[in-house]
Amino acid sequence: MLIPSSSSIPSSLSASASDSEPSSLNGSGISDQNILPNYHLHHHLINENEMEAANYAQVIKPTCEAFQDWPHTPMLYQQPQLHFMLPQHDWAYPHLAQSLPPPHHLTPSTAAVAAATIASQSSIINQTSVVTSTPSCQIKQEVERPEIIQRLMPPWPPAYQFSCDDSGSVSGAGGPHQPLSDISDDSEQTCPDDLEGFAKQFKQRRIKLGYTQADVGVALGTLYGNIFSQTTICRFEALQLSFKNMCKLKPLLFKWLEEADSTTGSPNSTFEKMTGQAGRKRKKRTSIEVNVKSRLEFHFQSNQKPNAQEITQVAMELQLEKEVVRVWFCNRRQKEKRIAPNQYDAPHPMALNNGYPMTADLFPYQAVVNHYTQQSPRQQ
């Protein structure tokens, strides 16, 4: 082993060694001052080697760890699989509930996270129930298990998904009620049978009172400010409107029917003047008996166009109104034209183009016929 000279030893090491260790002689006579510097130099070299190894480890180790932590190359065309699951209660997954740790083993942070998760799940469940609720179905929660939701089929078809209250207002399933008018009737308990019965009763009463469907629409417009067409009234009587519109229109027609019934017998009543229907009632259809009709037919064959005096005599004979007899003759002539359309347009056979009649002397038709009849046997 080579011992470096004293000139190569740092002065600090030699000074520290001389200060810290006392000078003594060993058994060979060599002083300790010559041995201690070599000892410190050896330890100094060892420390330098350890520092270099540590630096090498610090450089190599992060590189290896970084290589190990480097993300693997993703596979091509690998589609992520997303699974959407609605949040359920613990009773829906008992095997998962058993695997969860008991509550007393949870730390405060874990308990807070679990509480937040439960709150978010409950809010999502509420939002899901609100979104999935539609007007065409009803939601029912059982008393024993409020977390169970049952869907019931609607009693009406999808077109009939509305309900009415006492004021005739219409609202959707679960929506706020909006009053249509101040009229009140028993439309809260309205059902298809009630609407059908009311429509049939309304049609019978309207015809008996002599009002047309157009008259009813105009009257409703004058009373309530919304004129309904004749088609709407016709569709109501035929039950061709939706349940919502039937409920809207029923209280209006119910009120109009009460007013019309209360003013029966007074042709110029206040109700008719207010609705503008005075003098516009439909006249009842006249029914003529069979024997009276046969007498009228006899008079028609004798004279198709009677004058006013003859019409009056026929009316007195048959005990009919003069207007009824006049209208009957007019209708009978129209019927005759439909049966024989060319009868009234073709000229009379005994008339010329100038309108003067032809007599037998001017047109000896029979003599010509006899002449040709007599000549035919001679030719044979």
UniProtKB/Swiss-Prot annotation:
Keywords: Developmental protein, Differentiation, DNA-binding, Homeobox, Nucleus
UniProt keyword Glycosyltransferase present: no
GO cellular component terms, semicolon-separated: cytoplasm; cytosol; nucleus
Nucleus keyword on record: yes
DNA-binding region as annotated in the record: 281-340
Every POU-specific domain range: 187-261
Protein's name in the database: Homeobox protein ceh-6
Native source organism of the sequence: Caenorhabditis elegans
Phylogenetic lineage: Eukaryota, Metazoa, Ecdysozoa, Nematoda, Chromadorea
